[in-house]
Amino acid sequence: DDFEIPMQIARQGQRVLLDGRSLVFDELQNDMSGERKRKLRTLGGNFQSFARHPWLFSPRGNPIWLQFLSHKVFRLAVPYAMVCALISSLLSSTGWVQCLAAAQVAFYTAAWMGMRSPTWRKSRLIAFATVFVELNWTAMQAGLQFASGRLDLQWEKT
């Protein structure tokens, strides 16, 4: 609803505003499994809206088309871009690109270490890498599961 209703309002040519006095509550997840479930559900809802409303992708049909693409769609391409960046930099013979490949491998190694051990996650850098990789991995899973019809969109409190 927090996406569907504003998009219908925008489609009618009206402005969508958030009242600065609004109160928004979102409980922090204590564990990654709860966050993963929440992320799968919310991204699944995005994919469901995209499938229901093809006009969202039309520059003529969507008055906020550029904002929609940049805030909703391009973010979903990030996990795939990460995979492409890693593979292409690993295959490159250019020196500076190989340095970027080494940095990417170090980043993913840090994330892997954080996934394996709570002790490692005490480091802010490793914690950041871990959460960044896990959330992007979850975004990729959401897209693949939705495309294959295996994504459970049933709401449950996480």
Report residues per predicted region:
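Membrane-proximal intrinsically disordered regions of secretory-pathway and membrane-system proteins
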Residues: 11-13, 154-158
